[in-house]
Swiss-Prot record:
One of its GO terms (molecular function) is glutamine-tRNA ligase activity. It is found in: Cytoplasm. Belongs to the class-I aminoacyl-tRNA synthetase family. ATP binds at residues 35-37, 41-47, 231, 261-262, 269-271. This is Glutamine--tRNA ligase. It comes from the Bacteria. GO terms for cellular component: cytosol. Keywords: Aminoacyl-tRNA synthetase, ATP-binding, Cytoplasm, Ligase, Nucleotide-binding, Protein biosynthesis. The gene is glnS. Signal peptide: none annotated. Gene3D superfamilies: Glutamyl-trna Synthetase, Domain 2, Glutamyl-tRNA Synthetase, Domain 3, HUPs, Ribosomal Protein L25, Chain P. Its EC number is 6.1.1.18. It comes from Cronobacter sakazakii (strain ATCC BAA-894) (Enterobacter sakazakii).
Length: 555
């Protein structure tokens, strides 16, 4: 397969192919421009894969530029987390990290140019009045009484804004376009506003800050971006993007193209809502494994490769749609099924005693680290006469469909012996505390000599060698597919989104690395929690189950 055939195809790549074929561009330059006011989420991953992927495939460049024009909401913590997320996903930006604040001097000069052309003015309406004057989708706006100030007056007032001569909210710079435009974004949008706040890059040099729509297009042009890729909600903003560049003296005029944003079931993507989940302590933090943030997915055990594959599968279109959670889970399940070594852990343990096993004896049984990959080798796991099994793997009575341990019947212990349940011991509440069994000593990893069939296989952990572990069973954070549509999305939080169990694992997991994935046999895929990797007790997070459970949930 050729390189071109192996590439994904979509309408944006078709545009790029045409631009290269026509000679409009000889090299491709894209950018990823996050605002450093929160952690990146799975929706940003789609944009990262698109922009950096295009740069890779077309041997161009992709800039990482922080849209840092609102110092009140931004923080260096978010800057660092975003850089880490981009690199963890497997991408590298071209040259140094860029900031919109790098261009504050040029942006100011371009604003002065618009004033000199009679295309911008200082407005002293209050923010509430500006909203009122802007009109609605069905009613045109009306001109500000300050709209027709002279160029000289506007220059003086804009300089006064810069010098700190106005209080916040008392003045702003607006573009002079058309208050009757059918597009509200073109009704004299604000270009600069006053904020007396220290900026994480420029300190206290500025007290006026440019708005996104003014900053974005000029930053693209200054960096020589050829294709400025945004999500669909910025479609109308393209008119302002072009208006600004058409009316200033700048040699490069990038083009903006819009694609559909990623919507995922059973979660929210709004930074405001995600922030509320964190500040109100509905979750542990931005990296809570139930969060759709890249750091949350990473802590849960998602791999960068699985997220890239997910973004590849959902594709790039102009149609908004909501992706089922099963699609994301399928990507990580396939990845881990292929690559995760196997281990045994008992999540809901009950003691099982093999009464005819030599007392005080133990032995090592060999187990493959991966059933389909002999190159991953084997491991030795201790076995003894007292083991832990999962409570769900035993019943006193059961029908023929139940292929686990039943009183009076046999089952195989994974890679060990065939055992038969003889009797049980219960506490005062009727709860089984111990299962007593016998074993067939001639069945270590082989069938019974007399030819009898033993159909079920269950996993186990030797009690004498067991490693106590905390197991966190994560589920969807919300109980409805579209929590954002609820009047109060917090009322739809799934109270069972985290269930904590105290279990036992085979001793080899004592040296598990944080973030490394394991398949706990018959249970699912788990990883050691990075926040608790050095604690007294090992904490494992369930990344995903062995099978797709979403089809049942949706029925």
């Amino acid at each position: 397969m050729s390189e071109a055939e192996a590439r994904p195809t979509n309408f944006i790549r078709q545009i790029i192919d045409e631009d290269l074929a026509s000679g409009k561009h000889t090299t491709i330059c894209t950018r990823f421009p996050p605002e450093p006011n929160g952690y990146l989420h799975i929706g940003h991953a789609k944009s990262i894969c698109l922009n950096f992927g295009i740069a890779q495939d077309y041997h161009g460049q992709c800039n990482l530029r922080f849209d840092d024009t609102n110092p009140v909401k931004e923080d260096l913590e978010f800057v660092e987390s975003i850089k880490n997320d981009v690199q963890w996903l497997g991408f590298h930006w071209s040259g140094d990290v860029r900031y919109s604040s790098d261009y504050f001097d040029q942006l100011y000069n371009y604003a002065v140019e618009l004033i000199n052309k009679g295309l911008a003015y200082v407005d002293e309406l209050s923010p509430e009045q500006i909203r009122e004057y802007r009109g609605t989708l069905t009613a045109p706006g009306k001109n500000s009484p300050f709209r027709d100030r002279s160029v000289e007056e506007n220059l003086a007032l804009f300089e006064k804004m810069r010098a700190g001569g106005f209080e916040e909210g008392k003045a702003c710079l607006r573009a002079k376009i058309d208050m009757a435009s059918p597009f509200i974004v073109m009704r004299d949008p604000v270009l600069y506003r006053i904020k007396f706040a220290e900026h994480h890059q420029t300190g206290n040099k500025w007290c006026i800050y440019p708005m996104y729509d003014f900053t974005h297009c000029i930053s693209d042009a200054l960096e020589g971006i050829t294709h400025s890729l945004c999500t669909l909600e910025f479609q109308d903003n393209r008119r302002l993007y072009d208006w600004v560049l058409d009316n200033i003296t700048i040699p490069v005029h990038p083009r903006q193209y819009e694609f559909s944003r990623l919507n995922l079931e059973y979660t929210v993507m709004s930074k405001r809502k995600l922030n509320l989940l964190v500040t109100d302590k509905h979750v542990e933090g931005w990296d809570d494994p139930r969060m759709p943030t890249i750091s949350g997915l990473r802590r849960r055990g998602y791999t960068a490769a699985s997220i890239r594959e997910f973004c590849k599968r959902i594709g790039v279109t102009k149609q908004d749609n909501t992706v089922e959670m099963a699609a994301l889970e399928a990507c990580i399940r396939e990845d881990l099924n292929e690559n995760a070594p196997r281990a045994m852990a008992v999540i809901d343990p009950v003691k099982l005693v093999i009464e005819n096993y030599p007392q005080g004896h133990s032995e090592m049984v060999s187990m493959p680290n991966h059933p389909n990959k002999p190159e991953m080798g084997n491991r030795d796991v201790p076995f003894s006469g007292e083991i832990w099994i999962d409570r769900a793997d035993f019943r006193e009575e059961a029908n023929k469909q139940y292929k686990r341990l039943v009183l009076g019947k046999e089952v195989r212990l994974r890679n060990a012996y065939v055992i038969k349940a003889e009797r049980v011991e219960k506490d005062d509440a009727g709860e089984i505390t111990t299962i007593y069994c016998t074993y067939d000593a001639e069945t270590l990893s082989k069938d019974p000599a007399d030819g009898r069939k033993v159909k079920g296989v269950i996993h186990w952990v030797s009690a004498a060698h067991a490693l106590p572990v905390e197991i966190r069973l994560y589920d969807r954070l919300f109980s409805v597919p579209n929590p954002g549509a609820a009047e109060d999305f917090l009322t739809t939080i799934n109270k069972d989104s985290l269930v904590i169990k105290q279990g036992y694992a085979e001793p080899g997991l004592k040296n598990a690395e944080a973030g490394k994935a394991w398949q706990f046999e018959r249970e699912g895929y788990f990883c050691l929690d990075s926040r608790h990797a050095n604690g007294d007790k090992l904490v494992f997070n369930r990344t995903v189950g062995l099978r797709d459970t979403w089809a049942k949930i949706g029925e």
